[in-house]
Amino acid sequence: KIAEYVGAKYACAINSATNAIFLSLLNKNTIVNIPSMIPPVVANAIITSGNEVEFYDDVDWAGHSYVLHTFEDYKIVDSAQKLEPNQFMKGCEPNDLMIFSFYPTKPLGGSDGGMVVTDDYEKYKWFKTIVLNGMTYANNNWEREIDFPGYKMYMSSMQAKIIMNNFESYDKKMRVLGNLVDIYNRELGYENSSKH
């Protein structure tokens, strides 16, 4: 449902957006530039996945998406603080990755969790396999096979249930928050569009 909402073909649910960042950059051996005012989990995920971090000054990304890293043929977009209709379709190419967070303080909060969306089936299949201990996905557990060493990073059933329950009223929540943002902007002379 969330992939459809943001305009992507595929979505892989993960136990946290931090782990989604970690996996999306795993063994890329590159330098990733990130805003200096950002939760430490982002830098930690970049470093522990085998990369280096360089910081730049930027506060305008807060409450919005930003390009985490651009490779030769695709980019990774960190959208932990934003979730809007057709967001992937509007801001990404089919082979890009967009990462969402379902941490309790995020727009679509849950008990925790993350998601990677893309239109690239091969990337989607890789994520589905690596988060399931490197096993191929099959509805029947006994038909799963080990493809490669992976991680236990799949989203739990409890996380998914809470997120999907909250997703049912998400648009209403965004309308209410939008009205509050409008009031603050009008009264304080701001031009903020974030609902985070």
Region spans (language model):
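Short glycine/proline-enriched coil/turn segments at helix->beta-strand junctions
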Residues: 7-9, 25-31, 58-59, 68-74, ...
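Phosphate-binding glycine-rich loop
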Residues: 1-32, 45-49
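Conserved beta-strand termini and adjacent loop/short-helix elements that scaffold enzyme active sites
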Residues: 14, 56-58, 193-196
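Active-site region of PLP-dependent enzymes
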Residues: 83-85, 94-196
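Conserved residues at the C-terminal ends of beta-strands
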Residues: 14, 35, 101
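Short alpha-helical
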Residues: 19, 40-41, 122
